[in-house]
Amino acid sequence: MSSYRPYQSIERRKSRQIHVGKVPVGGDAPISVQTMTNTLTTDAEATIAQIRRAELAGVDIVRVSCPDEESTAALAEIVREVNVPIVADIHFHYKRAIEAAQAGAACLRINPGNIGSAERVREVVKAAREHGCSIRIGVNAGSLEKHLLEKYGEPNPDALVESALEHAKILQDHDFHEFKISVKASDVFLAVAAYQQLAEVCDHPLHIGITEAGSKRAGTVKSSIGLGNLLWAGVGDTMRVSLSADPEEEVLVGWDILKSLGLRHRGVKIISCPSCARQGFNVIQTVQTLEERLAHIQTPLTLSIIGCVVNGPGEALMTDIGVTGGGSGRHMVYAAGRQDHTVPADSMIEHIVELVEKKAEILRAEEAAAKAEAEAALAPAQ
């Protein structure tokens, strides 16, 4: 990623590209955001509704647990009714993997080592190949193989990486290369070290995450430290923020991490002050309201909400639209970094929403025009 501010540049690790349904993973593809449903998969209606909420939040890929035959039986309806590729989460039962592939799963999350015999692994790979499924090798510090625990004494980076490479070799021995790898741990130090080590010894796309990260607040902090560290170093091709919360919350946090590092852009990025006695309006309440009112906008743009003139004008220089608290019940509105007009306090929120929606519409039109112009330039001459 290039920038005229070199301190903002992140050079991503070069990796092979695979596909999870229509979503490319690895190579120069955008870093995709994932989540996992926490409904009973057999309750297809509830699972579909949850996935649709995650879609509205911006999810790219959704994982669904398939612990039994009834779950894989429900998978076909789920796949049919949603707009994002579905990863079937499989453990131990190789037949569930085959059934999930037949039901339309775009990817199978397995550990080849716990599927069973070489013949069973061969059957799973055959089903994946026939149905266009990729595979995710999911190594976890909490379920490492016995021989690795005996060798290393405890889950450590070497053990996680060795497990991942052993499983990768199983797939490669079957001439199957459409796979990605994860080496997750709940300990941030362990997870980051394992991913860094794995990134140095292979070019497979990496699914990054801090597993069992915790509650919404604690898990967000933990994941931001771990995933932010990896992404800043260029490691990671797809990601999931694991929270004990609704799946759409995981998606929103994932997007915020990517937006903070300039790796992807979606929706309105609000820059706001923590507020103090100098604030000309209630900053905290205003930001909360605007986040809700502007959640439907997907066009990337920036909005600064600053309570006073100490930092307000400076922040507005770097945003598409800005508001700075003033006196006498009126506040200054900035457009493209310049003072533009004032707005009465009692109509400020409605006014900002209107400005942002209009700006988003202009940006969408400009993007569409640029795309049409580029396509016309590539079209053969008549």
Swiss-Prot record:
EC id: 1.17.7.3
GO molecular function: 4 iron, 4 sulfur cluster binding; 4-hydroxy-3-methylbut-2-en-1-yl diphosphate synthase activity (ferredoxin); 4-hydroxy-3-methylbut-2-enyl-diphosphate synthase activity (flavodoxin); iron ion binding
Enzyme class: oxidoreductase
Keywords: 4Fe-4S, Iron, Iron-sulfur, Isoprene biosynthesis, Metal-binding, Oxidoreductase
Keyword Manganese belongs to the record: no
Residues binding [4Fe-4S] cluster: C273, C276, C308, E315
A Pfam family matched in the record: GcpE
Reactions it catalyzes: (2E)-4-hydroxy-3-methylbut-2-enyl diphosphate + oxidized [flavodoxin] + H2O + 2 H(+) = 2-C-methyl-D-erythritol 2,4-cyclic diphosphate + reduced [flavodoxin]
Cofactor note: Binds 1 [4Fe-4S] cluster.
Cofactor(s) in the UniProt record: [4Fe-4S] cluster
Pathway it works in: Isoprenoid biosynthesis; isopentenyl diphosphate biosynthesis via DXP pathway; isopentenyl diphosphate from 1-deoxy-D-xylulose 5-phosphate: step 5/6
GO terms classed as biological process: isopentenyl diphosphate biosynthetic process, methylerythritol 4-phosphate pathway; terpenoid biosynthetic process
InterPro entries from the UniProt entry: Dihydropteroate_synth-like_sf, IspG_bac, IspG_bac-typ, NO2/SO3_Rdtase_4Fe4S_sf
Function noted in UniProt: Converts 2C-methyl-D-erythritol 2,4-cyclodiphosphate (ME-2,4cPP) into 1-hydroxy-2-methyl-2-(E)-butenyl 4-diphosphate.
Record family assignment: Belongs to the IspG family.
HAMAP family named among the record's database cross-references: IspG
Protein name stated in the entry: 4-hydroxy-3-methylbut-2-en-1-yl diphosphate synthase (flavodoxin)
Species of the source: Gluconacetobacter diazotrophicus (strain ATCC 49037 / DSM 5601 / CCUG 37298 / CIP 103539 / LMG 7603 / PAl5)
